[in-house]
Amino acid sequence: MSSEELPSCGINDNDINNTIPINTRKVQIIPNGNTQCVKCLYNVANNVKDKKLSKKEKKEQKLKEEENNNNNNEEPITQQQKPIGKPIINFRSEQLCWECYRELILKKFKLNIVKVRESKRDAEKLLVALSGGTCSSMLLELLKQCTEGSGKAKMFLDIKCVHIDESSITPYQNHNDTIEFLKEFNNVKLGFPNLEIIPLEDILGTVTPLGERTNQLKLQFAQLSSETSKEDLLLYYRNQLLIQVAHKLNCKKVILGTSSNRLAVQLVASTSKGRGFSVPNETSVIIEQPSNDIKFYQPMRDFLLKEIFIYYRHLNILPVPVMFSILNLKPKHSINTLCEDFLHCLQDISNQTVHTLLRSVDKLISPSIDSNYNCSICSSPLTSAEIKSLEKVILDNNNNINKENKNNNNNNNNNNNNNGCCSTTKTEDSSCCNKTEDNSSNNNNNNTGCCSSSSSTSTSSITVNKETLCYSCKILYRDFKSTPNIAPYIKENSKQLLTTSQLKNEIKDFLLNSDDDDDDEDN
């Protein structure tokens, strides 16, 4: 294969320079036609440099070689006899053979997977999200190689796999074949027996029958007016199900097979949708979840899609049956597909596009966040402006409730003087609430009676308060054509956030500021 026919992947960044020092890069380009693996040539060049030893060391080495020749009657292995593989890929402008390429991919993967491990001796429980695509399949293959090593190279990992069945929303073309293939691939090929198939309908709970939940889920997505909102809601539901399964299996770490291309698309799409505040966290190797103790890891962040496909092809893994009936969507289908098409065009023009974006986002630092304030739908932290808006709404609601209470108390007092509903007379038929004493009527006005001041507020049950959502999710919630029967976890998160914010608003006058503590210490 000539150098022009080799697939080109990525850019010439510092990763390959860390593997092959810069001072030997001139040696790599010397061969005519560049039809040999660069790393193999580097190994040869490195051996040549090692032979430039002192006279004593050269004599000792010759004596050892002569002894070996006399004992084994074999010719010594020289530098020219070492095999040099044929290049199969231009890995970031460097030509590598399959063995060197496989070794480099595994090395880069281990550097990221080490960040997941907290203990080198105890087996780490990992939950791997298996979608059935190329990236997740390669992720499992690399994890298998990490667990099959010997000695120090072996990692002790307790791997459990989960597949979110989205056939109710995005129908699979060969649903049964896909599920059977995933089970066979996971159990037989890789040897991971723990595979769970979780339907997407479980996001609505498990109390109602599956058919009823399927209809509710379809109706919920049908009410969304834009395809972008449908894709985002599907992503949030999928992540929430992964968190629930992780809690169920007692796994605190979820491993995703997200490639660098997908993260670059997510970076541009999230910024265009107003989610720039959470971009540094969502595109890093470790995704923090402020609302719970589950963390998401993306160890394949450094690999391009083309690099993953070439690795996947050389492993001779059976292809997954076509899962979706529509694979090639139009670029203007949604914001996500539009950003994906835009970045693919830039990547074809310049190989530096994806890695430049990811290196740029690595330099971004999110401001300090309050872990108590998270979006009810996507669980991303709210900005300081959104928190202030939420506190303002709660303060206005409290003021309105106080005004209503005062007005109701005045009306009740007037009605009591006029023998109204809660009359103070001792006749049994003149009082609808059976109040016969002034004290009893005044006390019951503070409770939930027929003339209670809180009756109007208790009956108005708000399912999801828009102020508990981030900017992007507010747009998503606005896209619903009618009030949706949304997932229970969203209502629960919204209610909890409102309660927390209201409690903080009530006790804020009794809290001590840090400035006051400093003044006390100075005195």
Curated annotation (Swiss-Prot):
InterPro entries tied to this protein: CTU2 (IPR019407), Rossmann-like_a/b/a_fold (IPR014729)
GO BP annotations listed: protein urmylation; tRNA thio-modification; tRNA wobble position uridine thiolation; tRNA wobble uridine modification
Keyword terms of this UniProt record: Cytoplasm, tRNA processing
Pathway field: tRNA modification; 5-methoxycarbonylmethyl-2-thiouridine-tRNA biosynthesis
Bias (Basic and acidic residues): 57-67
Alphabetized Pfam families for the sequence: CTU2 (PF10288)
Region (Disordered): 53-81
GO molecular function: nucleotidyltransferase activity; sulfurtransferase activity; tRNA binding
Any GO CC annotation of this UniProt entry: cytosol
Annotated compartments: Cytoplasm
Chain's role: Plays a central role in 2-thiolation of mcm(5)S(2)U at tRNA wobble positions of tRNA(Lys), tRNA(Glu) and tRNA(Gln). May act by forming a heterodimer with ctu1/atpbd3 that ligates sulfur from thiocarboxylated urm1 onto the uridine of tRNAs at wobble position.
Family statement drawn from the similarity comment of this UniProt entry: Belongs to the CTU2/NCS2 family.
Name by which UniProt lists this protein: Cytoplasmic tRNA 2-thiolation protein 2
Species per Swiss-Prot/TrEMBL record: Dictyostelium discoideum
Gene that specifies this protein: ctu2
